[in-house]
Amino acid sequence: AMALINVIVTEGLEDKQFVECWTYGFDALKARVTDSELGMSPEKAEKITGISADLIRKAARMYAMAKPAAISWGLAIDQNANGMQVGQCILDLMAITGNVDVPGGNILGDATTGLNEVGFGFEKGVGSLATKMVGLDQYPAYCNLIMNAHADLMLQALETGKPYPIKFGMYAGNNLMSCTSAEPKRWHDAIVKSLEFCFTVDTFITPSAEASCDLILPLAASAERDGTTFTHYGASMGIKGFAQAATRTGEARSNAETCFAIGKKLHPEWWEDYKDVDAFTTHLRLSNKYEFREIAKEVYIQDECVYYKNECGRLRGDGKVGFNTPTGRIELYSTIFQQFGDDPLPYYREPAYSPQNTPELLEQFPYVLTTGARPYAFFHSENRQVPFCRELNPNPIVEINPKVAQNLGIADGQWVRIWNQFGECVEKAKITEIVDENTIHAQHAWWFPEEDGNEPNLYGTFRSQINNLVPNFHFGRMGFGAPFKNLLCYIEPISENYDTNMQLVWEKFKREDQ
């Protein structure tokens, strides 16, 4: 992304009017991306990425000269220690080409939408205790912007009891030991050792729930509950209301009902404005603009989409013209990053373990490991117990290039061991040219609901857990990021066969009417 900016600004392809009127720090950005040491030329980017300098130039020109144009990015941007700077560069690309909040460009959220759910109850419920949030003193940007304790430092607190012991836990639709945590066995051991009580609200009993929860509250599935959903995180927002369509099983409740019941029990005085869950939903999710029961009748409601909101005061809470930043402009030179102790301009930081940064490891671990691309059948660790989905992807897959397979004697469909200095797991090889010959791509979030769920097996989640190879405590200066996409590893064939018995999956999870 820095190299794309380099091409655009050196060739004068930026939207000069938008840059002059609505951005802050363009000259500083130009100086940074063209700097011989801190900048990023297409040739330098080619050495890092393997993408040719000519192709980088072609892509930059194509984007800059397409009016309008939009950029979409996904989770992978966050999954490295340099992720905040990658995001900064992508936003800079949108800004310098004038593709922000214009028809066909990248649309910003409307401040007048008024969603109440972010931070609901934080001031009343947490108050001065917020100053004791784990990690706040070291990473205030992380803790203040996403309003929770720093994840890696929470692991440290669980293990050491410092700055204070962690004794209570709650999961809500979270399967951290199978899906989201680096070094998951380390998290398992810390949680089991430290927590005196833990409960979860979930539709299924996961390895995380089995290992650490004293109480499991059944969560109503989508068809068993009322609810609302939004698109685009509030930008160009559409609202969908849905009403319960199926009879509930047992004592299942929705998340809203559970929060409402627990909240009223703990502090009834905070809930006096809400006579029932519908009123709570109307305020929290619909900002009192719509009544929930009216929304539930509709298939979809599209809010008015207003462009050029920076020109009419719809991006800022104070109603002033401009963008929601200290300068009122899109900050190419970020005063907010500067406030939190980071460089206000984008920079490239090589991953901690890479061919360039740790060449001494290449003899033992010659392949770049990337993880977590989403298969069609699953969303993270969900749907492993749905036989129709599991048929599409019955086993954990690692994709390797044909040249690598030939060199290592790996056959298509053979089980392999993947390992590095942090841990190991086993997955099933898929030979494909979709991955580079220096790269290994492994699926994540695997567990096997058809297996024994008791300790120590826990549905086999640690056996094919690629996060075993991912370390904690590798994040950026402001505390964000993790190295899920950029590590080193070795891979070798094994004689064992761990193929899923699909007949067992069907028998255990077939529909009641089958």
For each feature predicted by the language model, list its residue ranges:
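Extended redox/cofactor-interaction regions of prokaryotic respiratory oxidoreductases
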Residues: 2, 47, 92-212, 220-230, ...
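Short beta-alpha connecting loops at secondary-structure transitions
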Residues: 218-224, 237-248
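Hydrophobic alpha-helical scaffolding
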Residues: 19, 31, 35, 46-49, ...
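Long, contiguous, secondary-structure-rich segments that constitute the structural scaffold
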Residues: 245, 249, 253-299, 386-399, ...
